[in-house]
């Protein structure tokens, strides 16, 4: 799964795609509503391709987590990120069996599931080839 150019921004909901960059700012487009705006250096943004989930062994890249969800859900939407905490934890255990429960919080699980569903809604989750 290619997450290149997809970011999340602290303080803003949803995911954004980088459209272009210059010296002073970055032009981004919301995956939710398609609105474009400028992102300046004061904003804290993270590339999804650089985010990982802690396991007891190492750190799994987000793309691997999304691939696991896509396999489980046949590339369809996953559970709602607003499900109960227990439902989210039970679901995530099926996706990443050995995730580090002391370092991965329920809020992290909610974000991962929300991001997966946003990517799926925007056609960025492809059917897995067998």
PLM ranges: what are they?
Residues 71-97:
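Amphipathic protein-protein interaction modules
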Residues 55-59, 78-85, 102-109:
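Conserved phosphate/pyrophosphate-binding and hydrolysis machinery centered on Walker-type P-loop NTPases
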Residues 1-80:
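The feature represents the first ordered module of a protein
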Residues 87-130:
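C-terminal charged interaction modules
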């Amino acid at each position: 799964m290619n997450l290149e150019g997809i970011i999340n921004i602290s303080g803003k909901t949803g995911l954004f795609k980088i459209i272009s960059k210059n010296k002073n700012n970055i032009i981004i487009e919301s995956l939710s509503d398609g609105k474009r705006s400028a992102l300046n250096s004061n904003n804290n943004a993270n590339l999804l391709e650089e985010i990982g989930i802690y396991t007891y062994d190492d750190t799994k890249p987000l793309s691997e987590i999304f691939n696991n969800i896509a396999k489980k859900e046949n590339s369809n939407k996953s559970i709602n990120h607003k499900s109960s905490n227990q439902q989210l934890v039970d679901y995530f255990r099926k996706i990443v069996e050995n995730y580090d429960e002391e370092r991965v919080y329920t809020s992290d699980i909610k974000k991962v599931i929300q991001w997966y569903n946003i990517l799926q809604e925007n056609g960025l989750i492809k059917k897995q080839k067998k």
